[in-house]
């Protein structure tokens, strides 16, 4: 058994995903009778989904396949989200938990730009890790800000720093006021094998190096989130349904959510608060999907089938403006892990202000942050960069109007 080959588990999970996609919203060449039309929809090419009875049948089909994966007992969550991504970076197939249902196999020096085009950025040549990497895929300040306190996924997913050379030493540099340029930290040169680090170190100039890191196409956490979604549609957050895996939607969501916290007491209260009705619980699934899967290539397509892509882009823009003018810190403080001040203690960064009992003298360094723009005359981030993001889809104004923008009926 190897996750580098398509297995029955992956086939079941993929069929469930196809059923959910079929039950979701999609753009059509022309309106189809009996289908529901979305609020955000083009008059010529409407966004529609199938009728309620058909959706229920598709949810039941998805439930069948997801339950097959869960009850097979072949796959489990790695108890450590950090170790899950350490193993991926190390190119080690996990034979203990098998959280990854399927990975497209890659070859070092032959294929995969994970860690080069996507991942923590090396900003120029470094003595420790070699040459420059591009880190093209970016996350945003509102996304980093959205994580609940003590969620271990935040600092693994959001790399608000780059690696560079200063005075002959490789150092980590906090990015400062760069709210739309946070790198995806799941692929991280610091966690890769010596073979990969040596490959990068011996690659000259701007030449790409191929990491050989497998492309994971389905994780068990995705199975649990899809299961939670389906069970919520069929039975609500806590109900049971024939053909299920014997766990509720809430229990499936809790398994994914609680894995990210060393202490889950406060999270039980959160899970209870979002399990009061179908709509609230669905919104919690949408949030969990973002916290768990960002950067992996799935979120956009889930938002499309939920018809939330436009809404979430507009929400991100609104959240940024609100927080930039309010909650974002003008300056953030942080400590280093080592005496040479080369490695940042990510858990020390004061994104949400100084902790009780702490003063600025308790920190090694500081940088200007996302809230700094509210007191500057030049507002590059809010007035130039923000309007350009997804402007072809939502327009260049906060209200989502303008050429190319989706229109709410």
Q: What do these predicted ranges mean?
A:
Residues 260-271:
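C-terminal beta-barrel architecture of Gram-negative outer-membrane proteins
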Residues 301-303:
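Extended amphipathic alpha-helical segments with heptad-repeat/coiled-coil character used for oligomerization
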Residues 292-295:
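Conserved small-residue hinge/capping positions at short loops/turns
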Residues 1-116, 207-220, 233-251, 263, ...:
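Structured, solvent-exposed acidic/aromatic patches
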Residues 34-36, 274, 307, 328:
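Short alpha-helical linear motifs
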Residues 2-3, 65, 75-235, 306-409:
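Elongated scaffold/linker segments in the mid-to-C-terminal portions of large proteins
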Residues 256:
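Alpha-helix-centered segments that form part of catalytic cores
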